[in-house]
C-alpha cells in the first residue's frame, strides 16, 4: 500500500486489514519526493504502477528511530526497497481541503 503519509495512530488506520496487514508492504514514496502538491497523487500512482510492473516495493526513507507505536511485525519498507511479487496495490492520496482518493490497481494476467 502506497500511503500519502504514514499516520500517527497506526492501529486505528490499519485495523480493517486484520491479518492481511502482516502479509503486505506499506510505504510512502513522498519521503523521497517531498510534497508535490497537486502532482503528489499522480506521482504516487505512477510509483505504484511501477511497483506492480517490476515487483519491487520502494522504501520509506529517512526512518532512523524506533517508534513504540509502530508494531514491529508490520512491514513499512523502511529505508530499503524490497523485491516481492506485487499483484495488487493500493495508492492513497489525501489532499488539501479534503480532496481524498484511493486507487486499487492489479497486475493484468
Question: Locations of the language-model features?
Answer:
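Conserved "HGTGT" condensation-loop signature of ketosynthase/thiolase-family condensing enzymes
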Residues: 1-109
Amino acid at each position: 500500500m502506497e500511503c500519502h503519509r504514514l499516520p500517527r495512530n497506526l492501529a486505528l488506520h490499519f485495523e480493517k486489514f486484520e491479518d492481511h496487514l502482516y502479509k503486505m508492504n506499506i510505504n510512502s514514496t513522498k519521503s523521497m519526493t517531498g510534497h508535490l502538491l497537486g502532482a503528489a497523487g499522480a506521482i504516487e500512482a505512477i510509483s505504484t504502477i511501477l511497483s506492480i510492473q517490476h515487483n519491487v516495493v520502494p522504501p520509506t526513507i529517512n526512518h532512523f528511530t524506533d517508534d513504540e507505536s509502530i508494531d514491529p511485525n508490520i512491514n513499512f519498507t523502511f529505508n530499503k526497497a524490497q523485491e516481492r511479487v506485487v499483484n495488487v496495490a493500493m495508492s492513497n492520496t489525501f489532499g488539501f481541503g479534503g480532496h481524498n482518493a484511493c486507487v486499487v490497481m492489479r497486475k493484468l494476467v
